[in-house]
Amino acid sequence: MALMILPLIGSVSVSETLVAMITVCMIYMLMKFLHPDVPEAPPAPGPQALPIIGNVWSWENGLPEPHGHGQRYGDILQIQIGMRSVVVLSGHETVRQALIKQGHDLRPPDLYSFQFINDGKSLAFSTDQAGVWSPPKAGHECPALLFHARGHHAAVLLHVGGACLQGGRLPRQAAVQRHGTDASFDPFRHIVVSVANVICGMCFGRRYGHEDQELLSLVNLTDEFGKVVGSGNLADFIPLLRFLPNATMKRFMAINERFMTFVQKIVTEHYNTYDKDNIRDITDSLIDHCEDRKLDENSNIQMSDEKIVGIVNDLFGAGFDTVSTALSWSVMYLVAHPEIQERLHQEIKDKVGLSRSPVLTDRHNLPILEAFIFEIFRHSSFLPFTIPHCATKDTSLDGYFIPKDTCVFINQWQINHDPELWKEPSTFNPDRFLSADASELNKLAGEKVMLFGMGKRRCIGEMVARNEVFLFLAILVQRLTFHAVPGEPLDMTPEYGLTMKHKRCHLRATVRTTE
């Protein structure tokens, strides 16, 4: 056979043959390095899908129920949403393996709707992180941490004080309601507006009156965004729908455009009034950071001016909805468990007193309150799933094959209710996070609670959210006692959306004495 081929290729020397063989081997080794073989593994199990629509028909709002098929199929479940394969991950160790040990295999998915969030420049939703931060390690430094770390302590204290100020409004409102014709009121509205005001102060350096139309417009816009995103967008999974009339998608695009216009206006104002020696808020801090890096060509962290708008927008959205939802659930749990409410008040009375407002430095002295917050996060799991991820390459996890571009959902609800992690997970019990004598917080147990994701793509607003929830809740428990309205049952059934919220309701609040 070789002799038959030789006339076709001509005479070949031994050295040329060796060079050719070495070249072929090097190319083969390079291809193996760039495209390593994924160990042969079966696809993840899952329910039978229908053509085109997949498994969407079996879920409310087009989203998988957080407590659904996992018990039947295990920690790795494959489903079909429209025409796209989706893997749902459950189990603490499985999720830890995926997000931390194999975190480089995942990124935000290239979903159609994501390009309209922050004009495609969102830190949380963009598939291209290179334009925000250059190297992978620096790529996930939280801008809020940057704000704190750069020495802008006066501005930080100002906004911590703002949380105290806004937290104190609800007790005053309760006092007004108590002397009115109707002793009940909707605490959710006051919580949302107060939280929005603190976030505005931290991000934009401005605060509003609670009836200010610009503030209320922002609150309503954020509420609309949550409802639209929570209802799902099938155009992300059935491409044909992108070319058909879609009222939900039009509404989604309009909401994002209004957000961008608002933030762009504020960022422009900040550039015009920027003073390097007077950093007022996170926007100023990011501008300062951007200006410094422009002068340093060798900097590890690079950020364009236009990215500032997207980052500030992300921080506002992440901090606002998470905090307001956490606080509203907290009030509901206080009403549902009056004995815990009294226990929390007694701890604050003993450790902080009633003559001043609690501050962040009180946290280490209030382990019962910290445990209560952990249990709120765990039991309500109001963020049942993280922001979707996507496989960057063919990979395998726990013996199952996950093809490149597979969308990956992380089931936080299951982790927070896993009977292998938690004793009686359906029971609300803050003591699970305390030492036997309730004098210390069990930090190891707290680390198992999953609400803000895990690994390099943790929620960028986590630090802001935790601090605000602590301050607001400490002030409310110190100054108020919450009660259900007689004759009206307390309905804590969650309503699914971007975050799971309880049904709006009226409660009663009594102002506590300062003695």
UniProtKB/Swiss-Prot annotation:
Its main location: endoplasmic reticulum. Keywords: Endoplasmic reticulum, Heme, Iron, Membrane, Metal-binding, Microsome, Monooxygenase, Oxidoreductase. Its EC number is 1.14.14.1. It is an enzyme of class 1 (oxidoreductase). GO terms for cellular component: endoplasmic reticulum membrane. GO terms for molecular function: heme binding; iron ion binding; steroid 17-alpha-monooxygenase activity. The keyword GTP-binding does not apply. It is found in: Endoplasmic reticulum membrane; Microsome membrane. It is a peripheral membrane protein. Substrate binds at F225. Induction: By benzo[a]pyrene (B[A]P) and beta-naphthoflavone (beta-NF). It catalyses: an organic molecule + reduced [NADPH--hemoprotein reductase] + O2 = an alcohol + oxidized [NADPH--hemoprotein reductase] + H2O + H(+). Transmembrane segments: none annotated. Its cofactor is heme. It comes from the Eukaryota. The keyword Heme applies. Heme binds at C459. One of its GO terms (biological process) is progesterone metabolic process. Cytochromes P450 are a group of heme-thiolate monooxygenases. They oxidize a variety of structurally unrelated compounds, including steroids, fatty acids, and xenobiotics. Belongs to the cytochrome P450 family. This is Cytochrome P450 1A1. The lineage of its organism: Eukaryota, Metazoa, Chordata, Craniata, Vertebrata.
